[in-house]
Design a protein with these regions (language model features):
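N-terminal active-site segment of His-dependent metallophosphoesterases
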Residues: 2-97
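Short aromatic-enriched loop/helix-cap "lid" or pocket-rim segments at secondary-structure transitions
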Residues: 114-119, 188-189, 253, 295-297
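Acidic, His/Gly-enriched loop-helix segments that form or flank divalent-metal centers
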Residues: 145-280, 289-291
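Residue-level marker for buried hydrophobic side chains located in beta-strands
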Residues: 46-48, 75-77, 103-104, 175, ...
């Protein structure tokens, strides 16, 4: 889950809660070397919706866009669909709508579902060192407040969700994760890490063990479509991180983003960035909502002075300091 860049590059911290990655979050790349369930195979359209963050307006827009798609299709919420939705009625409405589709749990849902929460994991975000302590502490408190919106029945539904899935769109084999190929809260698909050649070598090794052509992820909250070359010059792999469906992703652009995979090109001009891989069209599909209403709803639950307001409101208004030309990255 995000941060709005109260960042301290190279800093160290004594805080563990919110920075640790619990052992039960781990699965490893080899789990993806399998066939998808019947519902996720032979797809013509796949939406991967990560980081909805309790934004009900964005949820309605995603469902509207998906309803316009044709053919064999599937919508997957890949975690952190809850976060700002501390109103119990809103929380339950979002959960009902999400669970009508395929869903994975993110760190938010996993921590909410814990029947005996402790302070060790905090928000479960496993924040790296470049995220400042203030963001970490506020996220831990947001999670604590969000838990008050849940019931035992709702938490049990979240606990039953898987941490990963496999999907095929056309012949494209996709690993669906919240974090990375190793862990539900891993930051291995963060744009900051993927900018480093040494880290991309690690990601190539994950691909070799996972036997997939692409990973679709979220968690780190900035969008990146990272291309990787393999030992075979004709072989290519991709990491598709949508950033956030329920918050702005780019400077001066208030749209959320979801990753759309399809055997057909996207019509309608809502692609912020796109590539074609193995005959499949992959787009960062814009989720545009009434920004004034979205801000009003956010402020009704998180007014000035609250933790989420301090961490997120400037991003909700102006977007992060991240440019469109940073999204698609090709290896030479």
């Amino acid at each position: 889950m995000d941060h709005s860049f109260d960042t301290i590059p190279g800093s160290s911290t004594a805080i563990r809660a919110g920075r640790s990655c619990p052992l039960h979050y781990h699965y490893g790349p080899a789990v993806f070397d399998t066939e998808p369930s019947e519902a996720l195979r032979n797809l013509e359209v796949l939406y991967v919706v990560g980081g909805l963050y309790g934004n009900e307006l964005a949820l309605h827009e995603v469902l509207r866009l998906f309803d316009q798609e044709h053919g064999r299709k599937r919508l997957v919420f890949n975690g952190d669909f809850h976060w700002f939705d501390t109103d119990p009625a809103t929380f339950e409405r979002i959960q009902r709508a999400v669970l009508a589709h395929t869903a994975l749990r993110g760190n938010v849902e996993t921590e909410l579902a814990d029947p005996a929460p402790t302070d060790d994991a905090g928000c479960g975000c496993a924040y790296p060192e470049w995220v400042g302590d203030g963001v970490v502490e506020r996220s831990n408190r947001i999670l604590t407040r969000l838990r008050s919106a849940t019931t035992a029945a709702l938490r049990a539904e979240l606990a039953a969700l898987p941490m990963w899935q496999r999907a095929d769109v056309g012949a494209l084999r996709i690993g669906l994760v919240h974090g990375d190929a190793q862990s539900l809260a891993g930051w291995g698909f963060a744009q900051e890490h993927l900018s480093q050649a040494s880290h991309r070598e690690q990601v190539r090794e994950w691909f070799s063990r996972a036997n997939v052509d692409a990973f679709a992820s979220t968690h780190t909250c900035l969008p990146v479509f990272q291309h990787l070359r393999c030992a075979d010059p004709s072989s290519h792999r991709w990491v598709f991180n949508n950033g956030a469906a329920g918050m702005p992703n780019l400077a001066g652009d208030t749209a959320g983003l979801v990753t759309r995979f399809s055997t057909r090109p996207l019509a309608g001009g809502l692609s912020r960035a796109g590539v074609t891989h193995a005959g499949i069209f992959v787009d960062a599909l814009a989720v545009e909502v009434d920004t004034a209403e979205a801000q009003r709803r956010f402020l009704a639950q998180w007014p000035s002075g609250s933790d989420a307001h301090a961490s997120y409101f400037s991003r909700i208004v102006d977007g992060p300091s991240y440019r469109l030309d940073q999204v698609v990255r090709l290896e030479n």
